[in-house]
Amino acid sequence: MPRFPHPAPENLRRDARPLLGRTALVTGASRRDGIGYAVARRLAAYGAGVYLHHHVPHDAAQPWGADPEGPEGVAAGVREARTDPAAVVAHGPGDLTDPTAPAELVATAIAALGTGRLDILVANHALSGHDGALDRIDVAMLDAHWATDTRSVILLVQAYARLRAALPARPPGGRVLMLTSGQDLAGGMPGEMAYALAKGALASATRTLATSLADLAVTVNTVNPGPVDTGYLDGEAHDAVAARFPSGRWGMPDDPARLLTWLATDEARWVTGQVIDSEGGFRRG
């Protein structure tokens, strides 16, 4: 006989609010077209309080621009998804290339959420553009992507881990979720060398971070969302990418959000140290 019995029937039924009472920080949640917003909405729908980090100057400098309703409009959309009226949804800015910003952001989020702890960290932010192929990249490009896409994430995880370690007990539900890209699949990303290197570092660090945080009852996983329609392509280029999916459509922000939010629940408590591709069968070849 197994030492641990099978769950009772009532424990097999899915809870409609599996994250009730828990808190989350989602970085890079500054546009309603983005993955961060989709993740934040699902976290709120699952019962969690959510702090949204944004860096509007980055979006404003991109071809797609900043969200027309600004950070408060983004936060309002997340509040609409709440299933716990008492759950806090707050937001604030931060330039995570500043080495002091990650720890400050974690502390700010904890204060805003009001529970004295942070359960779920979703490192969704990334630098877009400012990149090129091997023969075009320079030191500034490499440093910019390293600072934003890799260093800031590790510093966020460090600050989160230190605060979890300081808690009087080991509360369940500790989660670190990172996002990578398709840099390790098929032909890689030769036109985005700096980005691929920086995101590849997160994929490589996933298992090491999972081992480092295991004694704090924290799981660590990374998701490659594949091509997601966040408004950065249109016309023939958009159609060409869509044709490479078996479904004939791009991934939508809520597609990876479903996986990321599930990984934050207790159903995923036995999953850690994994890099998961969520690409809808995208054909890279």
Give the label of every model feature segment.
Residues F245-P256, E267:
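A conserved structural motif in NAD(P)-dependent oxidoreductases
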Residues F4-R14, D239, A243-R244, T261, ...:
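Short C-terminal tail/terminal secondary-structure segment
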Residues P2-G116, G129-G132, R136:
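Short-chain dehydrogenase/reductase
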Residues R117-L118, A203, L213-V228, V271-S278:
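Conserved Rossmann-fold SDR core element
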Residues G28, R32, P168-A201, T206-D215, ...:
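Catalytic loop of short-chain dehydrogenase/reductase
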